[in-house]
Amino acid sequence: MSILTLAGSPSQRSRSSALLRHAAQLLRARGLGISELGLRDVPAEDLVEGHYAGPAAHALRARVAAADAVLISTPVYKASFSGGLKAVLDLLDDKALAGKVVLPIATGGSPAHLLALEYGLKPVLSALGARHILAGVYATDKQVRVDDDGVSHIDDDVRTRLEDSVERLAEQLRPRGVVVNEAFDLGRLALAGGFSV
């Protein structure tokens, strides 16, 4: 399984990027492969001018196409997700997220900015073909801090919600045959134990 993380902030010390890195660590601990992509990986000129046919845009689309799941993080500015993230999403094909599990992650100044996920980001993800968008993780600036050394401090409540979301994402990526086999094995075990099934 291939998972792509897409950071919608140009700052390495961004709170939303800190949450994204923590989610990636949790997924790596489960043995899942992670590929990271940020705004700095696409030339600013390509983003500003929308160079859809350029080599960076082709590479971006190839990385998204290869992913089974995409985690997208963004800071919320002026009640919407970041313009840099929108510029990246504009370089994708119309159905670039079709068949992929998508987990949105955002941070903002107040709880009121949570609506930016539902009414700002999710409609754009849907327009890109995403049909399996997990409930997003939102945190306020007070709940996620990045110190001068770049070390992230995430409140327990946010950490728990992020871990739950990562668990749901991992469940969605688990091969369906594994679930069927486990159910089959439980049925055989019940029969062997003399239980009627």
Q: PLM features: residue spans?
A:
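N-terminal beta-loop-helix "entrance" segment that forms/cooperates
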Residues: 36-56, 145-151
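N-terminal beta1-alpha1 ligand-phosphate binding loop
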Residues: 1-32
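Glycine-rich phosphate/pyrophosphate-binding loop and the adjoining helix
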Residues: 134-197
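Helix-loop-strand module that forms the ligand-binding subsite of alpha/beta enzymes
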Residues: 52, 56-129
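Cofactor-binding loop segments of dinucleotide-utilizing enzymes, especially the Rossmann-like FAD-
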Residues: 8-10, 39, 107-108
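Residue-level recognition of beta-strand->loop/alpha-helix junctions
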Residues: 7, 38, 136-138
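Active-site-adjacent alpha-helix of alpha/beta-hydrolase-fold enzymes
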Residues: 22-29, 123-131
